[in-house]
Amino acid sequence: MVAKPRSRCCCCSVFIGVIILIAIIIAVIFTIRHRSNHSDDDGSNVKNYANALKIAMQFFDIQKSGKLENNEISWRGDSGLKDGSEASIDLSKGLYDAGDHMKFGFPMAFTATVLSWSILEYGDQMASLNLLDHAKDSLKWTTDFLINAHPSPNVLYIQVGDPVTDHKCWDRPETMTRKRTLTKIDTKTPGTEVAAETAAAMAAASLVFKESDTKYSSTLLKHAKQLFDFADNNRGSYSVNIPEVQSYYNSTGYGDELLWAASWLYHATEDQTYLDFVSENGEEFGNFGSPSWFSWDNKLPGTHILLSRLTFFKKGLSGSKGLQGFKETAEAVMCGLIPSSPTATSSRTDGGLIWVSEWNALQHPVSSAFLATLYSDYMLTSGVKELSCSDQSFKPSDLRKFARSQADYMLGKNPEKMSYLVGYGEKYPEFVHHRGASIPADATTGCKDGFKWLNSDEPNPNVAYGALVGGPFLNDTFIDARNNSMQNEPSTYNSALVVGLLSSLVTTSSSVESF
């Protein structure tokens, strides 16, 4: 009479055990699938991103001026060897800006700042692909120029060449013979934004070389401090004081560069003075609550992200009132990028690309994607699980998914089925607006007769590997024509942003907590 209930209990226990076992198995399968799906989203393209990164790095070599060392670009040679001679300084190094032979200090300094940031955040990823030394070499080639362009505390040479004269020619840099005039800023003709951006570049680069070359790092930091003081104590826009630059790299203001430079100097020195500057000038220059687009002209989004980094990792600053506006605006920038966010920007093509400007359209989606991966990695590394966007919450993986979508579009997942990174994939631009790439290396072509190569119907004889062209129109279309400089001209600052983005995507998400 007693055995039956016991038998029922045993059966029930076995039954419950089986149910639990099945539940565990289902949970394990779900977890594996979930991880697998995440891996498919974030990992299946890692090899593609790595290959693209290797290609992207080559464009810095293509753009080098000066006496080339260990040159692996067969169609490039020494050029610009006398640059700076009229001021008795050596400005032979540096990078040509785009498809021409100009050296514009403002975007070149931005290139150096972004490349430094990329190395600081993702140097380990670069090293795993044997690209770190290459990146540091490209950076030093640029900062060597910037150091020489700053011969005294309140003087900075910001341009080599006259763009009007330069654009009347279509020739190889190795064969140009025209006079290379210099443009400078000083206390009589200030240019706060250029001086401050160059200070940011020097400060960021000083961190890159802090361990490998302490003497060079110290030199960079000395110049950074001097340039920041020069910029702050002699405020004035270079676009106003030198109107000729307005047709090329016109600045919309210098407040963002001052905050950007002070932020980098704080990271490089931990001198409270620079953090105080940021806190005291944030209301005036920070444009709090108004998300904007990171570019060679607008450093605010980058500043917001860089300063929010301190709230993630710096003890005692997580609740800093002086950084609150920067952190909140950084969050607003991120919320605007996630497509399903209630505050998502509508500035996108039907193909899903962030689209802000017809000229150099890819700069903004690539820069936005780079910032998104940075912020995602800051969240993951610090254990912050959610980003609040109005009444909805998003995960770091949502930011990373957005970043991948922009990278994938750039690399060929777009309506044109074209890679906009030259040399990557089966289809990419063949008529890039780039003088050196368009003229055979053995051609004896001068200034004027070189235009036959601009107007040639034949693809470029030299492939400008790693060049990121301007990109598509709002309707996702692209015209691969050499005279289409709006869509088909590359630039060095685009390359710095691409290197940062791709470096962040070649491995699992993580971030160093301090530089």
UniProtKB/Swiss-Prot annotation:
<keyword id="KW-0732">Signal</keyword>
<dbReference type="GO" id="GO:0005576">
    <property type="term" value="C:extracellular region"/>
</dbReference>
<keyword id="KW-0119">Carbohydrate metabolism</keyword>
<comment type="similarity">
    <text>Belongs to the glycosyl hydrolase 9 (cellulase E) family.</text>
</comment>
<feature type="signal peptide">
    <location>
        <begin position="1"/>
        <end position="31"/>
    </location>
</feature>
<dbReference type="GO" id="GO:0071555">
    <property type="term" value="P:cell wall organization"/>
</dbReference>
<feature type="glycosylation site" description="N-linked (GlcNAc...) asparagine">
    <location>
        <position position="483"/>
    </location>
</feature>
<keyword id="KW-0624">Polysaccharide degradation</keyword>
<dbReference type="InterPro" id="IPR008928">
    <property type="entry name" value="6-hairpin_glycosidase_sf"/>
</dbReference>
<feature type="active site" description="Nucleophile">
    <location>
        <position position="100"/>
    </location>
</feature>
<dbReference type="Pfam" id="PF00759">
    <property type="entry name" value="Glyco_hydro_9"/>
</dbReference>
<protein>
    <recommendedName>
        <fullName>Endoglucanase 2</fullName>
        <ecNumber>3.2.1.4</ecNumber>
    </recommendedName>
</protein>
<feature type="glycosylation site" description="N-linked (GlcNAc...) asparagine">
    <location>
        <position position="37"/>
    </location>
</feature>
<dbReference type="GO" id="GO:0030245">
    <property type="term" value="P:cellulose catabolic process"/>
</dbReference>
<keyword id="KW-0136">Cellulose degradation</keyword>
<dbReference type="GO" id="GO:0008810">
    <property type="term" value="F:cellulase activity"/>
</dbReference>
<keyword id="KW-0325">Glycoprotein</keyword>
<feature type="active site">
    <location>
        <position position="433"/>
    </location>
</feature>
<feature type="glycosylation site" description="N-linked (GlcNAc...) asparagine">
    <location>
        <position position="250"/>
    </location>
</feature>
<keyword id="KW-0964">Secreted</keyword>
<keyword id="KW-0378">Hydrolase</keyword>
<keyword id="KW-0961">Cell wall biogenesis/degradation</keyword>
<dbReference type="InterPro" id="IPR018221">
    <property type="entry name" value="Glyco_hydro_9_His_AS"/>
</dbReference>
<keyword id="KW-0326">Glycosidase</keyword>
<feature type="active site">
    <location>
        <position position="480"/>
    </location>
</feature>
<dbReference type="InterPro" id="IPR012341">
    <property type="entry name" value="6hp_glycosidase-like_sf"/>
</dbReference>
<feature type="glycosylation site" description="N-linked (GlcNAc...) asparagine">
    <location>
        <position position="475"/>
    </location>
</feature>
<feature type="active site">
    <location>
        <position position="489"/>
    </location>
</feature>
<dbReference type="InterPro" id="IPR001701">
    <property type="entry name" value="Glyco_hydro_9"/>
</dbReference>
